[in-house]
Amino acid sequence: MTVTEGIHALAKWLESEVCPHIKLKVPSNERQTAAYDYQLANPSVHKMYAPPAKLAQQVNREICPGILVHLVNGRDMPRESARDLRFRLLLSVWNPGLHAEDAGADAAPFEANADGWNDVWNFMDLLLQRLRNAEQIGEVLRVKAEEGFDYKPYQEDGAIIDFYPFYFAELEFSCAMAQAPPSKYYAEEYL
């Protein structure tokens, strides 16, 4: 199994096992106006890098809400024909405040607040629950739940950054691959 197979397997698993189970607000160009009518969508999954906004629109996928799949590092153990991969998942949500649809018919059309952080942590709780229950991801990865799951708000230089009305959190965990590619044949066959 290759590193790219691991990244693709995790992204596919997130798209089928996590994202369909939550709907979050989609950013709009008409933010915080009385006529504001927000949309809900399932998060999208992006591998390694978030696409530029125009490219995401062309393929009809939102960047936010979303999950960005990063490979943090890997470790091969050739004598055991094994490979470990450490992943970071960056969750992104957008929520500028309370909309009438959220609060009921008698509510104001829009009331700005900073409670959108609840959305990113509810998203994280769903993801953690799914990972705890997953033994295998596709036929490629085994979740190493015994090593635990590390999560935190997104930070830069050790400080939590305020990107209101966007909220971010990250999760790191490890997976094992069934077998690393045999090195002496791999280059001849695949490269």
PLM features: residue spans?
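Small/polar-rich, solvent-exposed N-terminal microdomains that initiate assembly or binding
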Residues: 1-80, 186-191
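C-terminal tail/extension regions appended to the core domain(s) of diverse proteins
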Residues: 4, 11, 164-191
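Short, well-structured alpha-helical interface segments that form or flank functional binding sites
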Residues: 5, 64, 84, 118, ...
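Short regulatory "switch" loops immediately downstream of catalytic or recognition motifs
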Residues: 15-28, 93-104, 151
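Solvent-exposed amphipathic alpha-helical surface segments
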Residues: 17-25, 134, 138, 180
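Oligomerization/assembly interface segments of phage tail-like spikes and tubes
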Residues: 81-100, 104-110, 127, 162-179
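Short intrinsically disordered coil segments
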Residues: 104-115, 185-191
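Acidic-leaning, charged glycine-interspersed low-complexity segments
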Residues: 114-178
